[in-house]
Amino acid sequence: MILKNLLNELKCLIIEKLDFLNLYSPVNNLYIKIQPYYPWNIKPFIRRIRFYSKFVKKGDLCFDIGAHYGSYTRFLLRIGTKVVCVEPQRECLKKINEIYGKNKKVIIIGKAVGEKEQFSELFISESSNYISTLSNKWREKSRFSNNFKWTKTQKVEVTTLDNLIQEYSLPKFCKIDVEGFEFEVLKGLTKIIPFLCFEFTRELFEDAKKCINYLKSLGDVLFNFVKGASTYFFYPNLYQMINYMKK
């Protein structure tokens, strides 16, 4: 514990020094870019590229909804896709622009996504500017609710998946990771996207069922899930997944 605290203090001192010298942002961007190529990260990075290559190929269009600082975008770009990168949070948006702003295969949109066009209040974690949510339920009832204080807010413009599709065309793949706001995002979609993934947490599993039922209302769809950042489906066939959802 003492060693961990010392390392955290050292990390903070280094960040403060780099920030004072206006070096933190370029150094951090370099770290993000080379991180996948660290020896201990190469195999997981390759596995994820192989996994997503099952769904998309070079030239396909993808949506990264709730892009954070572009970790999914990075995998998709390595496959050769084009990515519409959507992120409302200022700090994350700044990071995405620094990393991908000059990439012609990336379109960066500084908006949130929801059921309808409007302006909403985005809650931002006091301890980490990179964690934010539009969901009151996620702030109050998720397993993360005791870990963060939500004293900061940001007014954000909200668009819909249908609007994005109308402007950029139907994507082959769409990833949605919006900290408990996934169902609201899906309610702004009236078309079936060939491949779509959304995040859910075990303590808010009923919300995941709502997402699945809504997608089923759009047409014939199949479901499975992966655990965490793994690169294999949890269930080998659809029927096991259906039985699990009925529990």
What are these regions (language model features)?
Residues M1-K247:
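Phosphate/nucleotide-binding beta-alpha loop and adjacent structural elements of enzyme active sites
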